[in-house]
Amino acid sequence: MNSLKSIIKDRKMILRLAKNDFKNKFAGSYFGLIWAFVQPVVIVSIYWIVFEKGLRSRPLPEMPDFPYLLWLIAGMCPWFFLNDAMNTSTNCLIEYGYIVKKMKFNIDIIPLIKIVSAAFVHCFFIVLVLAIYIVYGKIPTPYAFQMIYYSIGVFCFSVALVYLTSAINVFFRDMAQIVGIIMQYAMWVIPIMLSESQYPAFMRPILKINPMYYIVEGYRDSLIRHIGFWEHPLQTVYFWAVVIIMFIIGRTVFTKMKPHFADVM
């Protein structure tokens, strides 16, 4: 509880450091911050060409004429956020090692710096997604405001995971590479490129175990199906229960290891 209070107290510092981190990530490159937004657009374009133009994928049997691109970007949007947050935040304590060694600095906020930095790109991507929907003539309904709720959800899930992975990475430096590999495989056990109906029947219950299933499908409920999150009470309770449990585990490990961080930097 004390750590949460200290994080809230230092929220302005978190925001300031996150802005600096976001700018420094592309400092020195000719196009600068443009690269932060170009990369997800290029990735989406590749998947769109492969799955819709090449494989003729139709993910919604009940809506066979619904554009695959719109279905894809609704699922990719939260995934990009989690992927960016995990891959950049796991190594955050090493990257900010010079700060960790300062006894008076609240190192509890360091993992949040990277996640907030990733959230900046996520906000842009949400705007881009809404713009593409409008171009296609799919005007977002009030259900689209639910993306704020689901964004908070993926943010909290990222925080819960990163406290664990960043703490372990200080003592086991291969953790960052392991997380990167896991994230590559994890994309395919969530219905992002393929719909749930396109997976084998035995895999469909397994998909729902992944907390990101709730988030990805939530974005699509907000933009495509127009279904409220309150219409999935069991999934909602399950998701937040997992987040809380993972946060408790992550914070416990982080707190136990924190006194030794500076010694191994």
Sequence positions of predicted segments:
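Hydrophobic transmembrane alpha-helices and immediately adjacent juxtamembrane helices
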Residues: 1-265
